[in-house]
C-alpha cells in the first residue's frame, strides 16, 4: 500500500522544529512567504523553546512523532 506524502505545511513545521532544536537561526528559513513559512517559523519557535527547556534527544524525537 502506498503511503501518502505529508502535506507541505507539516513537513515545513517538522523541518523548522529540527532547526530550532539544533540552535540554528530563523533567518535560515528556506521559504520566502506564505503559510509554509509560517509553519516553518512556528516549528522553529517550538524547537527553540524545547531546546531552552532542556529536552533531550529522545524527548525531541517523541515530540516530532506526536506532531506528525
UniProtKB/Swiss-Prot annotation:
Cytoplasm in keyword set:
yes
Per the UniProt entry, what are the Gene Ontology biological process annotations, in alphabetical order?
A: regulation of translation
- For this protein, the parts annotated as crossing the membrane are none
Naming one, the record's GO cellular component terms include: cytoplasm
Intracellular or extracellular location(s): Cytoplasm
Pfam families per the record?
RMF
Keywords of the record, alphabetical order, are:
Cytoplasm, Translation regulation
Q: What is its main location?
A: cytoplasm
Which InterPro entries does its entry note? Answer: Ribosome_modulation_factor, RMF_sf
State the similarity comment.
Belongs to the ribosome modulation factor family.
Q: What does this protein do?
A: During stationary phase, converts 70S ribosomes to an inactive dimeric form (100S ribosomes).
Spell out the NCBIfam families in the cross-references: PRK14563.1, Rmf_CrpP_fam
Name used for this protein in its record: Ribosome modulation factor
**Lineage of the native species?**
Bacteria, Pseudomonadati, Pseudomonadota, Gammaproteobacteria, Cellvibrionales
Gene for this protein?
Answer: rmf
Amino acid at each position: 500500500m502506498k503511503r501518502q506524502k505529508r502535506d507541505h505545511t507539516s513537513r515545513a513545521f517538522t523541518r523548522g522544529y529540527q532547526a530550532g532544536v539544533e540552535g540554528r537561526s530563523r533567518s535560515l528559513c528556506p521559504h520566502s512567504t506564505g503559510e509554509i513559512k509560517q509553519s516553518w517559523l512556528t516549528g522553529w519557535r517550538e524547537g527553540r523553546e524545547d531546546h531552552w527547556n532542556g529536552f533531550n534527544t529522545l524527548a525531541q524525537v517523541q515530540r516530532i512523532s506526536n506532531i506528525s
